[in-house]
């Protein structure tokens, strides 16, 4: 958060399915390669490391609204995106089709950033277009964005 900004809203959504899939992948690599017998090779070590990193980076999605900025990031700060509130031209709560999945992907509605569930907030951002950010609290996020955009009396 930049100096002088006031945090108005923050929520971290945990992607239980993505986290479980990552852990499952680690177990498959570990036990499927005979590592429990002490036979973990270079490829197996790389694959295990890949699943550890992937799980750590994409198992949570945090959204923040300050008095000036909307930002979100995966895991401990990976893939951080930030937009000035003045550039947000529209906000609405949406439901994504199940086939949109999770992660970072381009859809018919613009970029989607999601770790769990089907609910999201769709933002129309000047010079960026439309993006969707998944959240377990879409109404609260929409309200926080709208309130933060109101002029201070």
Language-model features: locations:
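Hydrophobic alpha-helical transmembrane segments
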Residues: 37-47
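Short hydrophobic/aromatic segments of transmembrane alpha-helices and their interfaces
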Residues: 45-46, 53, 123-124
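Non-transmembrane, membrane-adjacent beta-strand/coil modules in membrane-associated proteins
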Residues: 73-136
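Generic C-terminal helix-cap and adjacent flexible tail
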Residues: 147-153
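N-terminal membrane-targeting/pre-transmembrane regions
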Residues: 1-37, 112-113, 118-120, 128-130, ...
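Conserved beta-hairpin
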Residues: 49-90
